[in-house]
Design a protein with these regions (language model features):
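Conserved N-terminal alpha-helix of the aminotransferase class I/II PLP-enzyme fold
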Residues: 1-17
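Conserved PLP-anchoring active-site segment centered on the Schiff-base-forming lysine
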Residues: 25-44
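Short, structured coil segments at secondary-structure junctions
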Residues: 32, 52-54, 144
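Active-site phosphate-binding strand-loop segment of PLP-dependent enzymes
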Residues: 58, 62-119
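Active-site PLP attachment segment
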Residues: 137-172
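Conserved PLP-dependent catalytic core of the aminotransferase class-I/II
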Residues: 101, 192-224
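A short glycine-threonine-serine/GTX helix/turn-capping micro-motif
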Residues: 159-160, 177-186
Length: 224
């Protein structure tokens, strides 16, 4: 579908609310024997999802790839003993600080460690990347992101969000994300609105370019 193509993934599931989607997705992806490794300054939806996890979790210093690797070493040692899977979670663009996550560097760690990477790109979708496809597109590492979350509440100016991944993962999430199974889906009017906004983004980068023009003007004015 259009969203999957836009973020360069195989399939996509629409979600009724972004916060609930991230929390519920984390819950669905891991069980109590699995290990989570996550950035210390992750959004509340990630932190709450991690807190619900009944297994081991290791936190790394914000955007510190060296510390992330240290935690991966700990996680992999435990995984070897228990057969656990490892899920690494970070953000594409951190909303509270305004800095990009070290997504490309974390993807590179896959050459040494066996883990899946979940990226919350709520602030990157529509604003970063040559075509607005997000932080992974901006950093040239979209293929290395296993589970990609984007929201409709920022650049789309709507409600809801989506999760994109391999078709097998998305199919699993459709039947295991409790926030989607036991709640109403997005109203069709909002879905149509999101598709229209996506059409505008795909047709022209002018809205994104205008955003960065205004952002850079503000930064220059504040510095001066």
């Amino acid at each position: 579908n259009e969203l999957s193509e836009f973020v360069e993934k195989e399939d996509t599931i629409l979600c009724n609310f972004g916060y609930q989607a991230v929390l519920s997705c984390i819950d669905a992806l891991v069980d109590r024997k699995d290990v989570i490794v996550y950035d210390a300054e992750s959004h509340a939806c990630i932190l709450d999802g991690v807190r619900l996890h009944m297994g081991k979790r290791y936190v790394f210093k914000h955007n510190d790839v060296e510390d992330c690797e240290k935690q991966l070493i700990r996680a992999e040692k435990l995984a070897e003993e228990t057969g656990a899977a490892i899920l690494v979670i970070t953000e594409g663009a951190f909303g509270m600080r305004g800095d990009q996550g070290k997504v490309k560097e974390i993807v590179a760690l896959k050459e040494k460690y066996n883990f899946r990477l979940f990226v919350d790109d709520a602030h990157g979708i529509g604003t970063l990347g040559a075509k607005g496809g997000g932080t992974g597109q901006e950093q040239g590492c979209q293929d290395g992101i296993d589970i990609y979350f984007g929201t409709f509440a920022k650049s789309f100016a709507l409600i809801g969000g989506f999760i994109s991944s391999d078709a097998q993962v998305v199919e699993y999430l459709r039947y295991n994300m409790r926030s989607q199974i036991f709640a109403k889906s997005l109203p069709m009017t909002l879905v149509k609105g999101a598709l229209k906004r996506l059409e505008i983004m795909r047709r022209s980068t002018a809205p994104k370019d205008k955003l960065w023009e205004s952002t850079n003007a503000l930064k220059t004015g504040l510095v001066d």
